[in-house]
Amino acid sequence: MMNYSCAKAVTDERRRTGNKIVLFATLFMLVATNAVYSQGKTPVSWKKVKVLVYTKNGKGYVHANIPSAVKAIQEMGRQKGFSVDVSDTPTVFTQASLSKYNALIFTSTNNDVFDTDEQKVAFMRYIQAGGGFMGIHSITGTERKWEWFKRLVGGTFVRHAKHQKFKQVIVDKQHPATIDLPAQWEVDDECYYMNTINPDLKVVLAHDLRSVNDPEKPMWFGDSYPSAWYHEWDGGKQFVTVLGHDGKMYDDPIFRKHLLGGLQWVLAGNKKLDYSKARAVSPTDPLPY
């Protein structure tokens, strides 16, 4: 039988060992968390940044918000010191042209926005070379039949609730796209839903479905549904927000902070494009996973 002093020694050692394990686990989680956010919080040398805003729409509905979105991004560029080019012409999608940009911003693009497979491949190779990408509002309704693109943006639009005021839930309070948002944020917008979702998305913001008037709202995620997310896929960094239907939103300082934070995450930590890593030869190349 173990005497009291021996038992106490064993208990103390187990406690010390347990504390060490807890401490190690805590430190590991902190390091992992910091690793996730370090790129997003890395200061961006804005004056060295050049972005392309792409606004092409295929046959079908075209959002009236596009001029407002372009104006907002241009004004943010002037405030921060980064350059902004704008195009609705798919011929801009060549390696020579895209290699000038640190990030591409697709704002309220919809349906088919490329004319040729060569343009699609140039876009794929840009992403694979490490190019940044940000999609705004109806981006999930863009290129709905192209599997690679659907995985890039994170999902495929299926429908939205009627335009109304409803609340947003901040899922990740430390991300640059949400860190400056109010704890209670009500938007006057459309609640977008998708019928496919890439499983690797890191959601930062969600629709509060309890505040949405929609008898057909899906309850796959309980009372919330993703509205903004980020991931790193096929060599590049992507940020998407489905908010921004009404052109007036782009004058809202809060929404601008949301957009600028998303762009900051895309740009932070980015290295120069490395086309030696680009491998695409066809839009139907096998997906990374």
Model-predicted regions and their roles:
Residues M1-G18:
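N-terminal secretory signal peptides that target proteins for export/translocation
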Residues V22-T33:
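Bacterial N-terminal signal peptides
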Residues N34-S38:
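Sec/Tat signal peptide C-region and signal peptidase I cleavage site
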Residues G40-V49, A72-F82, D88, V212-N213, ...:
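Extracellular ligand-binding/catalytic regions of CAZymes and related secreted enzymes
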Residues V51-T55, L98-E143:
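Short alpha-beta junction capping motif
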Residues N57-G60, P90-F93, T109-V113, F133, ...:
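Solvent-exposed loop/turn segments at secondary-structure junctions
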Residues G58-K71:
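Glycine- and acidic-residue-enriched helix-capping/strand-helix junction motifs
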Residues G155, R159-G235:
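Catalytic beta-strand/loop cores that center a nucleophilic Ser/Cys/Thr
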